[in-house]
């Protein structure tokens, strides 16, 4: 049967990459943790390949995170969406490797992100001239269990030598092969960032619970229509809001969410007597206003409950 990564099968120098991608797709339905690990191995191969092509030093002890935030990788992709997609795979891969318990939606999104990363990279490197969007109907049901490999081999010389130098140094961003659905993408990225910071979602809209992250929380006192709905509110153990998160369309500048988030924060302050820390994000870029008098700054993830308490106490 056809799979999404079949196109790699006959490209001999990409045999290792094909193994990782194929393993990820085969286990997506049957073993979410394994799928996430296969995706992470594929990502690691890709990152190392980009460094090798750029003659950049990988270094013995550099972590995947260090390589991914390094200039060779970031400048090569030149697209916030793909960089965020790569970090998504890295983070879910970490969950799979340590605690386990990757969800079906997370495994699927890892696979989709891997497809876009591999495709975008190979198109930019002119290894491919075209690639169809990801087709989720091709994912095998109850696929075989394939144990992820422990190590990631270096890209073979044959591959490195086959790529034209001008493609490696090209300023053109790597293309996006499969468009992300706005809502799904934003939600999956934000939910993972919350999970990463130790926040548990309530699981039902407009429910405020101590120590949990509530979604679509009704707030009163908004200008014009009085009632508004905050995308996420993070509650402390006393049931008061520690933070509010406003998510805007990924295609929009996240600053559009800033004004909205500030309005929600003010309404929550009027209700609870405490001003929440403000986050606004488009899923790919996230900013915080901590209420300590600093201008908004970009961050890689949300604060944990403890860190938010520290911010509140420092005011």
Where are these regions (language model features)?
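Amphipathic alpha-helical interface elements
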Residues: 1-155
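ATP-dependent helicase/translocase motor core
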Residues: 123-315
């Amino acid at each position: 049967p056809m799979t999404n990564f079949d196109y790699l099968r006959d490209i001999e120098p990409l045999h290792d990459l094909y193994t990782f991608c194929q393993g990820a797709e085969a286990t997506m339905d049957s073993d979410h943790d394994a799928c996430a690990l296969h995706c992470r191995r594929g990502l690691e191969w890709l990152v190392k390949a980009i460094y090798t092509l750029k003659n950049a030093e990988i270094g013995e002890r550099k972590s995947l995170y260090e390589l991914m935030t390094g200039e060779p990788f970031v400048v090569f992709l030149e697209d916030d969406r793909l960089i965020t997609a790569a970090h998504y795979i890295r983070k879910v891969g970490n969950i799979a490797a340590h605690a386990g318990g990757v969800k079906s939606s997370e495994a699927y999104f890892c696979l989709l992100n891997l497809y876009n990363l591999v495709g975008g990279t190979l198109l930019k490197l002119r290894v491919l001239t075209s690639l169809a969007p990801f087709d989720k109907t091709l994912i095998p049901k109850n696929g075989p269990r394939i144990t992820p490999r422990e190590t990631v081999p270096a890209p073979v010389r044959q591959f490195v030598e086959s790529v034209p130098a001008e493609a490696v140094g090209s300023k053109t961003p790597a293309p996006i092969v499969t468009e992300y659905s706005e809502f799904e993408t934003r939600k999956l990225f934000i939910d993972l960032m919350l999970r990463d910071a130790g926040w548990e979602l309530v699981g039902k809209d407009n429910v405020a619970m101590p120590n949990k992250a509530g979604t679509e929380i009704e707030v009163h006192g908004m200008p014009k229509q009085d009632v508004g709905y905050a995308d996420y509110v993070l509650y402390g153990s006393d049931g008061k809001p520690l933070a509010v998160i406003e998510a805007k369309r990924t295609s929009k500048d996240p600053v559009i969410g800033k004004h909205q988030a500030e309005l929600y924060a003010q309404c929550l302050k009027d209700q609870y007597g405490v001003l929440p820390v403000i986050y606004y994000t488009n899923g790919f870029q996230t900013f915080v206003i901590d209420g300590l008098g600093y201008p908004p700054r970009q961050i890689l993830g949300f604060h944990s409950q403890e860190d938010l308490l520290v911010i509140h106490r420092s005011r």
